[in-house]
Amino acid sequence: MGKRIIVAGGGHGGIAAAALLAEQSFDVTVYERNRREDMGYDWTDIFDKNGLFACGMEMPPKEKYRLKNDMTFIAPSRTAKIKQHVPEEQLEIQMERKDIYDHIIEFAEHCGVKFRFETEVKAPVMLGGRVAGIRTKDETVYADLVIDAAGINSPVRKNLPDCLGIQKETDKYDTFHVYRAFYNKTATVEGDKYRVYLLFDGKQQICWVADDEEYTDVLIGRFTPLTDEEVEETLTKLRELNDDLGTERLRGGQYVTIPVRQPLGVLVADGYAAIGDSAFMTVPMIGSGIANSFKAARMLANAIFADDKELYSAETLWSYQREFYKKLGNGLAPLAVIKLMIASFSPNDLDYCFEKNILNSDDMTIGADTNSINCFIKKMMNFDSLRTKTVGVMSEPEMSKKIFAMVTRISAVMAVTRAMPVRYDRRAVNLWVKQYNKCFKVD
């Protein structure tokens, strides 16, 4: 052991993988552009606590987390709403982002991970077709393996040679541009504490207004970048509907881009493995990926431990790719197709889904294990619910076309993911990933 591993970027999954490896005597260093005190956005996040257990971490102190509130989804016309009812055992935990980072960095340092903060990774070092290290502003650092945890716009992934078959850029509807802030709370909320507005104000956007003990949490998200003027206009309209949303911003106010797409088609190359947002491991419907990244960290560590010749090649790392897709990716990828269909909906389309009960509380009940198309299929197996959905869909020809196209595309995605090569062969993998990526193309 003792091989040198670099984690490029301080993503959650990368730090978790670093901890597991350092614990087994690997020499692991995380290179992160931010200062230690700036790790984590100034807001809260929700995730499945089982992700912590997957990579050997304990629960944080009780005062550092709480269970999330059920969400109420409001139709574009605001004439109908659906409230989810997540069973208590499926409730995700909600934590401050900075507290999440405190928890995992402390764990990683205890395991022996070294951190280089305020050190931005600029590009990979390539030796032929192998990733052999990273370049920063001031130095070139070599390693036996580079774990890419540098996020959605990773400079490592974006600068890999095309011959590796690893997608560099995102496509239309792959990313969500988000503004999030916390404002003073100006009224007590007795009813729906977590209000999610779908296609709010007739625009292709999602907004939420969530009651907290000390403030009101606001999110505005679109597939296109937001301007300050658009945010202020939307906030004004949200305040007209929500008495608890004040005008004094207490925290947050950042603009962030998050991935809401299928997982990266190829996760590995010689000397390289992608994880977390670098590999688009979020749930496409909601953009949450912390737990998936933690679970992937365990899978990656297992693949590295199994490489007794310490080659860290695409061939030996392919077991990580296979395990990730078997346990997570095969279920996440079809959800990206559902997201693409919803992205094509007009406000009238979505209102129709509410009105005809094509969407119901079960569909919107997203719990800790809702990270697979199979979760939604199981919910639809209720005969009465399925009959209601079928009648509603078949009664509207344009809706029928969209649903049929979605089902056809989901079937194609499931067939392609099942056909993933069992062993790594660059030519076979490149042919496969072209078919995989093609499943998600939009005009």
Where are the regions a protein language model picked out?
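Helix-loop-beta segment of a Rossmann-like dinucleotide-binding subdomain
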Residues: 78-97, 133, 212-224
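Glycine-rich FAD pyrophosphate-binding loop
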Residues: 8, 22-41
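Predominantly flavin-linked oxidoreductase catalytic cores and closely associated redox partners
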Residues: 107-243, 280
